[in-house]
Amino acid sequence: MLIVQQFQKRSFIIPSLISSGLSYLSKDIRLADKMEDGELHFPKTEFEKSQNTSRPLFQRPEPNYPGHVPLYNFEKLLMFLGSSIGAFVNPTNNNFIVSLGESTAFPWVLNRLRTQMLNDPSGRQILKERPHMTSKSLNLDELKNYPDNSLGKSYFLWLEREGVSPDTRVPVKYITDPELAFVFQRYRECHDFYHTITGLPIVREGEIALKLFEFMNLGIPMTGLGALFAPIPIKSSQRRRLLSVYYPWAVKNGTICKPLINVYWEKIMKKDIDVLRSELGIEKPPDMRELRKKARSKKKQVA
């Protein structure tokens, strides 16, 4: 009887052990199958994605538009310091002026200009169409045949007299946002029209006067810095002329003038330039070249 009971117990235990062993073995087999199929690992795409999120500390981000050069904040600071010193020591070097302009073109400044453009019909059209000024797009050969006092003819004659071209404007490359980069590029390309409408020449004194006019009208930091520091190293006679004649003119006219960033110059080339000045609220300053000529003549007479 005892033997039978023990046999019955064994007959119960043995199947249980066999069942447990098969279950364990089955788990191992399923585990091996999953490992073979790669189901226990990240999917390949997710793994690669996680690997791509980590990059070297100073790996430059991808550009946001053609020609864009992304900069870290410390690089922008270094560019500002270097270009500001360079522009003060050698203001005729355009590279310093260009770098200083972009390193101080803060987003809040450009956003304010963009808002002004969005609130104006012409400004909105400019933002939508994003035109760029070149000799080809402006058709200079046609402008020279415009009426004598038209904006187009005046612009052409000013380019001829000063020996400059709209093709020399350097593309913006350090401003991060594409639309804000266009806003600053638009200012840069319209600079020669500001010379044309005011009659100020491309001499150091004329550029300084125009910088203050631009700062009062547009609020671009680089123009304010230029108006503040550029008169320091020039001749005392030029500085007196700026402070007595052209700075008061620039403050008054830059303040009351309509925002020049909204002027679609390409669309109004046939407009009479005197009528345009009146519409914009600009009073033409005294002819700087004539004043400089008279000052030199007077100096020779005294000598």
From Swiss-Prot:
Pathway stated in the Swiss-Prot or TrEMBL entry: Cofactor biosynthesis; ubiquinone biosynthesis
Co-factor(s): Zn(2+)
Primary location group: mitochondrion
GO biological process, one term: ubiquinone biosynthetic process
Chain sites annotated for binding Zn(2+): 191-192, 195, 207
GO cellular component: extrinsic component of mitochondrial inner membrane
Location relative to the cell: Mitochondrion inner membrane
EC number from the UniProt entry: 4.1.1.130
Membrane topology designation: Peripheral membrane protein
InterPro entries membership: Coq4, Coq4_euk
Keywords: Lyase, Membrane, Metal-binding, Mitochondrion, Mitochondrion inner membrane, Ubiquinone biosynthesis, Zinc
Catalytic activity, as annotated: a 4-hydroxy-3-methoxy-5-(all-trans-polyprenyl)benzoate + H(+) = a 2-methoxy-6-(all-trans-polyprenyl)phenol + CO2
Subunit structure: Component of a multi-subunit COQ enzyme complex, composed of at least COQ3, COQ4, COQ5, COQ6, COQ7 and COQ9.
Entry similarity comment: Belongs to the COQ4 family.
Primary role: Lyase that catalyzes the C1-decarboxylation of 4-hydroxy-3-methoxy-5-(all-trans-polyprenyl)benzoic acid into 2-methoxy-6-(all-trans-polyprenyl)phenol during ubiquinone biosynthesis.
General remark: This protein may be expected to contain an N-terminal transit peptide but none has been predicted.
Protein's recorded name: Ubiquinone biosynthesis protein COQ4, mitochondrial
Source lineage: Eukaryota, Fungi, Dikarya, Ascomycota, Saccharomycotina
Gene name linked to the record: COQ4
